Regions:
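Conserved ABC ATPase signature
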Residues: 132-136
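Catalytic Walker B motif of ABC-type/P-loop ATPase nucleotide-binding domains
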Residues: 157-161
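Helix-to-loop junction immediately C-terminal to a conserved catalytic motif
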Residues: 49
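Conserved ABC transporter NBD signature motif
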Residues: 57-65, 77, 111-115, 217
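ABC-type ATPase nucleotide-binding domains, specifically the catalytic core motifs of the NBD
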Residues: 13, 69, 94-113, 121-123, ...
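ABC ATPase C-loop
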Residues: 149-150
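The feature captures the beta-strand-to-loop junction immediately N-terminal to the Walker
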Residues: 34-36
Length: 235
């Protein structure tokens, strides 16, 4: 299995958030993680990427047990996270941000070549490569966040609400970017409140409820959509 989570418990102090989460994620898929506000979606992604420590349970990525490893070692293995909100370094230029994405590697020429490739793949970044990144628009910043994550050479990308705060037009662009990355072989776990966007690009849907995965289905399975709507609309 590509990513395998078994009976995962995560607390904040005495507050129990994840209470026995188990899920299997296949390589090459876009997996959509749904759940009400506060259900623990961000907590789960942060636990996979090593930013949170679980109380018990295990997380396996290919042949490696991730829990217990430092977050930078998890990143080196190829599991990268895009956090909620846009995490770029606002006072640095586009290129400087991309260089940071390659921080764990040393070969300067190879890094420069990859930055060139990234600027071709996302022409808007190429055009604004020398701009301070705080001057980029919301959608451009989101593109930079994705490019930055790709610089880490991720195999699995964990994305927490990439469409947050974007206009409908830019939301479509983010969706296209995500499907494009997936076609190139990147596996993606997506947390997305925009149900229409999430369901339109996901292969598999997981619903987090009461600290567990309460539902898991193919996104083509309509009962998954109904279940998700029930959670979101409370109906
Ligand atoms: N660092 C923290 N310390 C204490 N409690 C936390 C911390 N982070 C999150 N929580 C709590 O844990 C619960 C789960 O939070 P989490 O951010 O994982 O939810 P979420 O599903 O991502 O919600 P949203 O959809 O609003 O982003 C919430 O009740 C939240 O208040
Ligand atoms: Mg969240």
């Amino acid at each position: 299995m590509f990513l395998s989570i078994r009976d995962l418990y995560v607390n904040y102090g005495k507050f129990e958030v994840l209470k026995g989460v188990s899920m299997e994620i296949e390589e090459g898929k876009i997996s959509l993680l749904l759940g009400a506000n506060g259900s623990g979606k961000s907590t789960l992604l942060k636990t996979i990427s090593g930013l949170n420590r679980p109380l018990s349970g295990s997380i396996w990525f290919q042949e490696t047990r991730l829990n217990g490893m430092a977050s930078y070692d998890i990143l080196r293995l190829g599991v990268a996270q895009i956090l909620e909100g846009r995490r770029i370094f606002p006072h640095m230029t586009v290129v400087e941000n991309l260089e940071l994405g390659a921080y764990s590697r040393r070969n300067k020429r190879e890094i420069a070549r990859e930055i060139e490739a990234m600027c071709e793949r996302f022409p808007i970044l190429g055009k604004k490569r020398k701009e301070q990144s705080s001057n980029l628009s919301g959608g451009e910043q989101q593109t930079l966040v994705i490019a930055l994550a790709l610089m880490t050479k991720a195999k699995l990308l964990l994305m927490d609400e990439p469409s947050q705060g974007l206009s409908p037009l830019l939301v479509n662009e983010v969706a296209d970017t995500i499907t494009g990355l997936n076609k190139d072989g990147l596996s993606i776990v997506l947390v997305e409140h925009n149900l229409r966007l999430g369901l339109s690009i996901a292969d598999q849907v997981y619903v987090l409820e009461n600290g567990k995965i309460a539902f898991d289905a193919s996104s083509k399975d309509l009962s998954g959509v109904e279940y998700a709507q029930k959670i979101y609309l409370g109906g």
